[in-house]
Swiss-Prot record:
This is Small ribosomal subunit protein uS7c. Its main location: plastid. The keyword Cytoplasm does not apply. The gene is rps7. GO terms for molecular function: rRNA binding; structural constituent of ribosome. The keyword rRNA-binding applies.
Length: 155
């Protein structure tokens, strides 16, 4: 038994302007080399672009996009008897959101375009509509889990 106390789970802080935890999670994932102010600039510009494109509440578009990309199930490599199986596992809400944000940012970075704010806004709008690379990644993950359903008992 461990002599150390268990670590308390940290709660995600909210950003200063929108008071939203999802925005803060997005800022922390988009940040590179500790440049948080630049990450905030990119996010806020992307939010303005979403406002201009859709003429709706940009935070609802963000929520809808993340909800659409969040996976319910994923596969995890598990070594059993000398061979590695892809075992489907259920994903919790926090981990699912983190994966969704990672996929959205990855898809945004791959997009052709002028700047990151433009690419991110386009990807978020597409994801909210149900298309885009991030949605495709989620569907691919679900297909993999479905194909490897026979190994679900290896959990």
């Amino acid at each position: 038994m461990s002599r150390r106390g268990t670590a308390e789970e940290k709660t995600a802080k909210s950003d200063p302007i929108y008071r939203n935890r999802l925005v803060n999670m997005l800022v922390n994932r988009i940040m590179k080399h500790g440049k948080k102010s630049l990450a905030y600039q990119i996010i806020y510009r992307a939010v303005k672009k979403i406002q201009q494109k859709t003429e709706t509440n940009p935070l609802s578009v963000l929520r809808q996009a993340i909800r659409g990309v969040t996976p319910d199930i994923a596969v995890k490599a598990r070594r059993v008897g000398g061979s590695t199986h892809q075992v489907p596992i259920e994903i919790g809400s926090t981990q699912g959101k983190a994966l969704a944000i990672r996929w959205l940012l990855g898809a945004s970075r791959k997009r052709p375009g002028r700047n990151m704010a433009f690419k991110l806004s386009s990807e978020l709008v597409d994801a909210a509509k149900g298309s885009g690379d991030a949605i495709r990644k989620k569907e691919e993950t679900h297909r993999m889990a479905e194909a490897n359903r026979a190994f679900a008992h290896f959990r």
